[in-house]
UniProtKB/Swiss-Prot annotation:
Segments traversing the membrane: 30-50, 57-77, 84-104, 121-141
Gene from which this protein is expressed: spoVAC
Disulfide bonds: none
One annotated GO biological process: sporulation resulting in formation of a cellular spore
Coiled coil: none
Membrane topology of the entry: Multi-pass membrane protein
Recorded GO CC terms: plasma membrane
Keyword Repeat carried by entry: no
Compartment annotation: Cell membrane
N-terminal signal peptide: none
Stored InterPro entries: Spore_V_AC, SpoVA
Name assigned to this protein: Stage V sporulation protein AC
Predominant cellular place of this UniProt entry's protein: membrane
Keywords, alphabetical: Cell membrane, Membrane, Sporulation, Transmembrane, Transmembrane helix
Amino acid sequence: MTNIKENYKSKVKTYQPKPPYVWNCVKAFLVGGLICAIGQGLQNFYIHFFDFNEKTAGNPTAATLILISALLTGFGIYDRIGQFAGAGSAVPVTGFANSMASAALEYKSEGLVLGVATNMFKLAGNVIVFGVVAAYIVGMIRFAFEKLMS
């Protein structure tokens, strides 16, 4: 039986199309770079027209990108961008907003508490947990280095 399974797997492998890894990386790089360029343009806009500095313009820039991402998710456009770009649209803050907005839209028929609030953090919760843990670890390493160097 094992020989038959191995033979089947080898035959399937010969006919299975190879994923275009290089092209997928190029698309992710270009779309992710475009999202970051839009973010930089928004930050420059806030600095120039609203008298922010580089440090204070970050929060309204992120909020604007999140709002745009949530709107594009609601209109079904961000899903098409994600299908084309893959990780290029999932890694920036817009991907996090997309995951929360799409879950909220999917479960809105079940009500605000049991539908939206319960299911909104299913995918995004992992990102939050690992982000907090990584920030804690990096903070402890930095604290240790500062104590050792002083």
